[in-house]
């Protein structure tokens, strides 16, 4: 359910805005999205795992808040991020 340190580092490298960047909204959203995808796959096989389901809802809420913040601060970065992550259809 969790992501490996190597995968997390790869996401940081892919979505960073500058060198040494680990906390920008883009990086945080990318990491949360990866965790959400993994947890969604887990819940497909373990439908009655309600503790994990609640954790999923918390993560989705965190991602929504970060995306709202990014949209408020910089619409262009927001649009680029959701396109790269494939969040909107």
Swiss-Prot record:
One of its GO terms (biological process) is translation. One of the primary rRNA binding proteins, it binds directly to 16S rRNA where it helps nucleate assembly of the platform of the 30S subunit by binding and bridging several RNA helices of the 16S rRNA. Forms an intersubunit bridge (bridge B4) with the 23S rRNA of the 50S subunit in the ribosome. PROSITE patterns: RIBOSOMAL_S15. Keywords: Ribonucleoprotein, Ribosomal protein, RNA-binding, rRNA-binding. The keyword Ribosomal protein applies. InterPro entries: Ribosomal_uS15, Ribosomal_uS15_bac-type, uS15_NS1_RNA-bd_sf. One of its GO terms (cellular component) is cytosolic small ribosomal subunit. Part of the 30S ribosomal subunit. Forms a bridge to the 50S subunit in the 70S ribosome, contacting the 23S rRNA. It comes from Rhodospirillum centenum (strain ATCC 51521 / SW). Pfam families: Ribosomal_S15. GO terms for molecular function: rRNA binding; structural constituent of ribosome. The keyword Ribosomal protein applies. Belongs to the universal ribosomal protein uS15 family. This is Small ribosomal subunit protein uS15.
